[in-house]
Amino acid sequence: MATPPKRRAVEATGEKVLRYETFISDVLQRDLRKVLDHRDKVYEQLAKYLQLRNVIERLQEAKHSELYMQVDLGCNFFVDTVVPDTSRIYVALGYGFFLELTLAEALKFIDRKSSLLTELSNSLTKDSMNIKAHIHMLLEGLRELQGLQNFPEKPHH
């Protein structure tokens, strides 16, 4: 016995809805999580560079030739140390490379790196907004496909 055309249309609609829901959850939401996680890592890097800038500015203001401090060796294990010359600093360039710079050079590097990281975070924010817009558009399409009405919000009195 053949299925009625209306029932086939309902089944086809149900399959489409399932495919769209799967695409939203498996692809778009996963991509959104990846973009937001990457942006969070960029924010962490930016915060570290800004913290380093503050330390360098304090060093320049203090004008001490020696610096007493504690260094974290890992796992919150700190040791006391003395930095005999504070006129130069080693800065992590990335990919495991470090460069010895004067404090002024380090500040210039930090400014450039901070602006690049800010541009990257802005780009990632824009990407996340595009993905959210795609999710919203697909959800609206699903709503229409399922024949759901968009109920207006009740006015708050």
UniProtKB/Swiss-Prot annotation:
Main subcellular location: cytoplasm
GO CC term, one of those recorded: nucleus
Subcellular location per the Swiss-Prot or TrEMBL entry: Cytoplasm; Nucleus; Cytoplasm, Cytoskeleton, Microtubule organizing center, Centrosome; Cytoplasm, Cytoskeleton, Spindle pole
UniProt-listed InterPro entries: Prefoldin (IPR009053), Prefoldin_subunit_alpha (IPR004127), UXT (IPR003994)
Single GO MF annotation: transcription corepressor activity
Effect of residue 59 to P: Causes dislocation from the centrosome
Top-level taxon of the source organism: Eukaryota
Alphabetized Pfam families for the sequence: Prefoldin
Transmembrane segments: none
Keyword annotations of the record: Activator, Apoptosis, Chaperone, Cytoplasm, Cytoskeleton, Nucleus, Repressor, Transcription, Transcription regulation, Ubl conjugation
Tissue expression as described in the entry: Ubiquitous. Expressed in prostate epithelial cells. Expressed in mammary epithelial cells. Highest levels in the heart, skeletal muscle, pancreas, kidney, liver, adrenal gland, peripheral blood leukocytes, lymph node, prostate, and thyroid and the lowest levels in bladder and uterus. Overexpressed in a number of tumor tissues.
Gene Ontology biological process terms in this record: apoptotic process; centrosome cycle; microtubule cytoskeleton organization; mitochondrion transport along microtubule; negative regulation of transcription by RNA polymerase II; protein stabilization
Gene3D superfamilies: 1.10.287.370
Family: Belongs to the UXT family.
Subunit record text: Homohexamer. Component of the PAQosome complex which is responsible for the biogenesis of several protein complexes and which consists of R2TP complex members RUVBL1, RUVBL2, RPAP3 and PIH1D1, URI complex members PFDN2, PFDN6, PDRG1, UXT and URI1 as well as ASDURF, POLR2E and DNAAF10/WDR92. Interacts with LRPPRC. Interacts with androgen receptor AR (via N-terminus). Interacts with estrogen receptor ESR1; the interaction relocalizes ESR1 from the nucleus to the cytoplasm.
Purpose of the protein: Involved in gene transcription regulation. Acts in concert with the corepressor URI1 to regulate androgen receptor AR-mediated transcription. Together with URI1, associates with chromatin to the NKX3-1 promoter region. Negatively regulates the transcriptional activity of the estrogen receptor ESR1 by inducing its translocation into the cytoplasm. May act as nuclear chaperone that facilitates the formation of the NF-kappa-B enhanceosome and thus positively regulates NF-kappa-B transcription activity.
Name the UniProt record assigns to this protein: Protein UXT
